[in-house]
Amino acid sequence: MEEHSVGPLVPAVVKPEPSKNFSTDTTAAGTFLLVPTMSDLDKDFLCPICMQIIKDAFLTACGHSFCYMCIITHLRNKSDCPCCGHYLTNSNLFPNFLLDKLLKKTSDRQISKTASPVEHFRQAVQKGCEVTMKELDTLLLLLTEKKRKMEQEEAERNMQILLDFLHCLRKQKVDELKEVQTDLQFIKEDIGAVEKHRMDLYRARDRYSVKLRMLDDSGGRKSRHSSMDLNSSGLASSPLNLRGGLSSGSHTKKNDGKSQISSHGHGIQRRDPITGSDSQYINQSGLALVRKKRVHTQFNDLQECYLQKRRQAADKPHGQQERDTNFISREGYSCGLDDFQSVLTTFTRYSRLRVIAEIRHGDIFHSANIVSSIEFDRDDDLFATAGVSRRIKVFDFSAVVNEPTDAHCPVVEMTTRSKLSCLSWNKYAKNQIASSDYEGIVTVWTMTTRKSLMEYEEHEKRAWSVDFSRTDPSMLVSGSDDCKVKVWCTNQEASVLNIDMKANICCVKYNPGSGNYIAVGSADHHIHYYDLRNISRPVHVFTGHKKAVSYVKFLSNDELASASTDSTLRLWDVKQNLPVRTFRGHANEKNFVGLTVRSEYIACGSETNEVFVYHKEISKPLTWHRFGTLDMEDAEDEAGSYFISAVCWKSDRPTILTANSQGTIKVLVLAA
């Protein structure tokens, strides 16, 4: 995707004005000296060229004095006096010794005014000031004592700094030790709780196995007794009924045989799930090994997740802890452990994405193939696609999955004037779908007539995103490159609200729990969270992305996921206005690659032509799937040419619709 944002100007740093009384001069040694200026000295002491105190004064034939280097440099370019313009050459320059002496004395006086007593003493000694041996001894004693005191103070300061450092280090390590000890206590308690729960499960399994064996044994005895009774009654029958009795007896024996076989077979069938056959045991053992391997692969992230949840549970208010105590006594688990078990279960449940259906671009698309948006309808029965082909195509999901063909025909198809960027189904009116296009037009379509119900043309540039409200089916919101967010109502032609964002709008999304709140992602790298009842300023601006925010999606009323062209996803808490987690693993630097959320899972595309799935509690990918191509010529350039362009979860199961820039659509499902 292209960024058109104009970044904020960096404020200019205002430099402080130099002092009017002194100017700074840097010596060769790099020290700064205070040099007197015109307020302290007569202007005649200043060189007319450099406007500083004259150094190595030279006099011209016309009577003006300059620094030697200043006048020599001037005469290399011009042959006149800088003051009066009189003709002048190097032969007309003469050293001005008197002025040099006067300037030197003036400079010495200025230095003496600002010099320290030590500097005065040093200058006096250098000038040959006579000092007696006794005076020198006294001075040496004073200097020695002064040096000793300074060394003592320096040593004390160093010791104090070292001691402060060691105290800080000790405090830090003690805090870390306390934290580790607390964590170890959490782990010890949780190990005990898990072991107890596991033993309870084993005992329950054993009790159930014994009960099944008892039922099987009693069933076998009953069948044998009934068989003996029937046989004895047949033998005691009259001769007239002997044939019938025999036939009846033989029939009964046959039925009993079937019953015994059936009962025996049924008994095996019921025992297998409990005792387990060898193949089942091997499969279960292999699955356990795979899950353990996945745990070790993401051990650091899982460890962080566990400790975070346990610490949060321990830091809860007293009233909340009492409720958690009731939970612990009832379930045997702490609240934090229960939360982590849920994370661990959902994280290790799946390890790959499996393709269950595919629609080839060559059969349903033509010259333009990029699928910009793919969305399920309210009941997940239908899904719609749109993109640069200027068509909205609606497919029957069950037909796509169950019919073994790559070329599926849409059940509804609508043609548009412009390329499409986004789709949004109405969550109440099943036959309504909204679209945004490259001309900035937002259109509401009806499936029954296959025509537009409303067209909104207020956007001045390309509209990137549109979204229906989940709580009010008549409201929808859109965002555009014209830097405006517009709220629409299907009952009126003009926009209801207009928010000027001062930056290109890439995505908009309603909060699923309230029609008053929207999240807006823009090219200024930020997410603006607005309350539509007061649009003068956002409720909060979430910062952290380094480039434009291309997608925003709500996992819940309080959790917001965002995608950016900085190759990261981020999770935010819109209730506490805090960042929660950053996800890395996919590549996304310029294109819209799609973002979709479902319960604990977040999925997005990548510019490597791969689909990535993340668990919301783990910052690294859960799994990923690479789109392949059947064309060998395309296979070489696939990694650099194609990218995932749209993704969408099915709400009732771990199934995801994916599409790429080649126009290929795949139905993927999370598998173990």
UniProtKB/Swiss-Prot annotation:
Its annotated pathway? Protein modification; protein ubiquitination
Which GO terms are recorded in the biological process aspect for this UniProt protein?
Answer: proteasome-mediated ubiquitin-dependent protein catabolic process; protein ubiquitination; red, far-red light phototransduction
Q: What are the GO cellular component annotations?
A: cytoplasm; nucleus
Q: Does the keyword Oxidoreductase apply?
A: no
Query: Quick one: where's region SNLS (subnuclear localization signal)?
Result: 115-172
- Location of region: Disordered: 216-279
| InterPro entries reported for this sequence | COP1 (IPR042755), WD40/YVTN_repeat-like_dom_sf (IPR015943), WD40_repeat_CS (IPR019775), WD40_repeat_dom_sf (IPR036322), WD40_rpt (IPR001680), Znf_RING (IPR001841), Znf_RING/FYVE/PHD (IPR013083), Znf_RING_CS (IPR017907)
**Which stretches does UniProt call biased (Polar residues)?**
228-240
Main location per the UniProt record: nucleus
Residues spanned by motif Bipartite nuclear localization signal? 291-314
Write one Gene Ontology MF term. zinc ion binding
Q: Which domain of life is it from?
A: Eukaryota
Catalysed reaction(s)? S-ubiquitinyl-[E2 ubiquitin-conjugating enzyme]-L-cysteine + [acceptor protein]-L-lysine = [E2 ubiquitin-conjugating enzyme]-L-cysteine + N(6)-ubiquitinyl-[acceptor protein]-L-lysine
Q: Where in the cell is it found?
A: Nucleus; Cytoplasm
Tell me the first and last residues of the signal peptide: none
Q: Positions of the zinc fingers (RING-type)?
A: 47-85
| WD repeat residue numbers | 366-405, 415-455, 458-498, 500-540, 544-582, 585-624, 639-671
EC number assigned by the record: 2.3.2.27
Keywords from the UniProt entry? Coiled coil, Cytoplasm, Metal-binding, Nucleus, Phytochrome signaling pathway, Repeat, Transferase, Ubl conjugation pathway, WD repeat, Zinc, Zinc-finger
Segments carrying the region annotation (CLS (cytoplasmic localization signal)) are 62-172
The entry's function note states: E3 ubiquitin-protein ligase that acts as a repressor of photomorphogenesis and as an activator of etiolation in darkness. E3 ubiquitin ligases accept ubiquitin from an E2 ubiquitin-conjugating enzyme in the form of a thioester and then directly transfers the ubiquitin to targeted substrates. Represses photomorphogenesis in darkness by mediating ubiquitination and subsequent proteasomal degradation of light-induced transcription factors. Light stimuli abrogate the repression of photomorphogenesis, possibly due to its localization to the cytoplasm.
Family (UniProt): Belongs to the COP1 family.
Q: What is this protein called?
A: E3 ubiquitin-protein ligase COP1
* Gene transcribed to yield this protein: COP1
